[in-house]
């Protein structure tokens, strides 16, 4: 199987993440999309990051009804901070029967040369890139292992959602019903 790995904090997972995953699953040659919950992003501050298992629960709830989606906690047991190259190596060794593609936003492509061992990633894996606001035209767009995928340009931010929760405002339509129920019942983000 050909699997797209969609890494993220998913703090929380929102409809933008689901739309991108569905677009990748339905309009490319991918058989599945795995949402890889990152315990810690080396490029992001850790202040308002929910515990990894809580974020994994939200991802699992959000994607439960799509047979082409899978939630992965594979990075939880790997050394922190999590570097994509290390996870890709680990996951490829663990599942040699599959081929893997990295799903990233155009904003990440702009910063890709800052990633640990980015040349190794580009040599061994394809990048399926979806559009993001305020992205520049990275020279990597022309790389043979980079594929630009037409997808809706969405400006939904997890920070915005967390702020709404803190202000006790509705997050309906920004997250799935299942995720909204988890956030409200477990009081996620209320005091961040």
UniProtKB/Swiss-Prot annotation:
CDD domains per record: NMNAT
Single Gene Ontology MF annotation: nicotinate-nucleotide adenylyltransferase activity
Keyword ATP-binding: yes
Catalysed transformations (reactions): nicotinate beta-D-ribonucleotide + ATP + H(+) = deamido-NAD(+) + diphosphate
Keywords in alphabetical order: ATP-binding, NAD, Nucleotide-binding, Nucleotidyltransferase, Pyridine nucleotide biosynthesis, Transferase
Recorded metabolic or biological pathway in which this protein acts: Cofactor biosynthesis; NAD(+) biosynthesis; deamido-NAD(+) from nicotinate D-ribonucleotide: step 1/1
Record-linked Pfam families: CTP_transf_like
Biological process according to GO: NAD biosynthetic process
Domain of life: Bacteria
Family annotation (Gene3D superfamilies): HUPs (3.40.50.620)
EC number, UniProt record: 2.7.7.18
Functional description taken from the UniProt entry: Catalyzes the reversible adenylation of nicotinate mononucleotide (NaMN) to nicotinic acid adenine dinucleotide (NaAD).
Database matches in NCBIfam families: cyt_tran_rel, nicotinate (nicotinamide) nucleotide adenylyltransferase, PRK00071.1-3
HAMAP family noted in UniProt: NaMN_adenylyltr
Family statement: Belongs to the NadD family.
The protein's name in its UniProt record: Probable nicotinate-nucleotide adenylyltransferase
Species of the source: Cytophaga hutchinsonii (strain ATCC 33406 / DSM 1761 / CIP 103989 / NBRC 15051 / NCIMB 9469 / D465)
């Amino acid at each position: 199987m050909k699997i797209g790995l969609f890494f993220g904090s998913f703090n929380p997972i929102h409809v933008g993440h689901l739309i991108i995953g569905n677009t990748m699953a339905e309009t490319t040659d991918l058989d599945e999309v795995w949402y890889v919950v990152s315990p810690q992003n080396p490029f992001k501050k850790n202040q308002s990051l929910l515990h990894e298992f809580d974020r994994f629960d939200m991802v699992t709830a959000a994607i439960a009804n799509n047979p082409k989606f899978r939630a992965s906690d594979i990075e939880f047991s790997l050394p922190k901070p999590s570097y994509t190259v290390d996870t890709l190596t680990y996951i490829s060794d663990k599942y040699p029967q599959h081929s893997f593609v990295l799903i990233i936003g155009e904003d990440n492509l702009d910063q890709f040369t800052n990633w640990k061992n980015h040349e190794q990633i580009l040599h061994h894996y394809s990048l399926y890139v979806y559009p993001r606001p305020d992205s520049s035209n990275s020279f990597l767009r022309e790389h043979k292992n980079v594929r630009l995928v037409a997808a809706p340009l969405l400006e939904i931010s997890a920070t915005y959602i967390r702020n709404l929760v803190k202000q006790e405002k509705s997050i309906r339509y920004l997250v799935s019903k299942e995720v909204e129920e988890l956030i409200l019942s477990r009081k996620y983000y209320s005091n961040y």
